[in-house]
Amino acid sequence: VLARAIGPSLTAVGVPNALQDPTLELHNASGTTIASNDNWKTDQQTQITATGLAPGDDRESAILSAPLAPGNYTAIVRGTGTNTGVAVVEIFQLP
């Protein structure tokens, strides 16, 4: 599974007030954080690039996870510091 938080790239497609530096957290059904990322190139860059789904901006976040057990999960996107704005969360099931 690849989860992405896209913000800065939205500006190029005309989305106003795009979140300029999103962070991403993935939580399990108990609310426990199972993964987090700020700036996708800081963690798992090689593996994320190999999927062909790397975010278009270095400030965007991505988490590459081993297959998740069936169940409910929550993705939380926040801006760093006091940043606010519009972001998109994308979840990809990889082969």
Question: Each predicted region: which residue ranges?
Answer:
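Boundary/junction segments of secreted and surface-exposed precursor proteins
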Residues: 93-95
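Short amphipathic, basic-aromatic surface patches that mediate peripheral association
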Residues: 1-17
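Noncatalytic accessory or regulatory domains flanking protease catalytic cores in secreted, cell-surface
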Residues: 20-90
